[in-house]
Amino acid sequence: MNTYNARLYIFSLALALVILKGTKCYMYVFLQEPGAAFCVDDSGVRYKPGDVWYDDEKCEKLRCSGAEASLKIIGAGCGIIHVVGCETVRGSGHYPNCCPRPKC
């Protein structure tokens, strides 16, 4: 990941968190290298435009979006949930089923 993409990723994630504060999910956009024919995730795996995949460790759904030469990865994940007097229990499976839920 080059410096431009790293900065844009951090900015996009921070902006999404500010906008979506208090909601049950977050979303972010990670722009790919200009002229790229594939989306490349943090693990180096390549995806074609339209591909959807899951990061079960982070409980996120990701999608390679756009046309070649202007591709981006759009990610969605769980928000922060806190209910006083309850514990938080992580779900199972892919996003959104893996999102934590209060257990009272």
From Swiss-Prot:
Q: Which UniProt keywords apply?
A: Disulfide bond, Secreted, Signal
- Which InterPro entries did the record assign? SVWC_dom
Q: Where is the signal peptide?
A: 1-25
Expressed, tissue-wise, as follows:
Expressed by the venom gland.
The subcellular location is:
Secreted
Kindly give the SMART domains that the UniProt entry links to this protein: SVWC
One of the record's GO cellular component terms:
extracellular region
S-S bonds: none
Q: How is it modified after translation?
A: Contains 4 disulfide bonds.
Q: What is its main location?
A: secreted
Q: Can you say what this protein is called?
A: Toxin-like protein 14
Upper lineage is: Eukaryota, Metazoa, Ecdysozoa, Arthropoda, Chelicerata
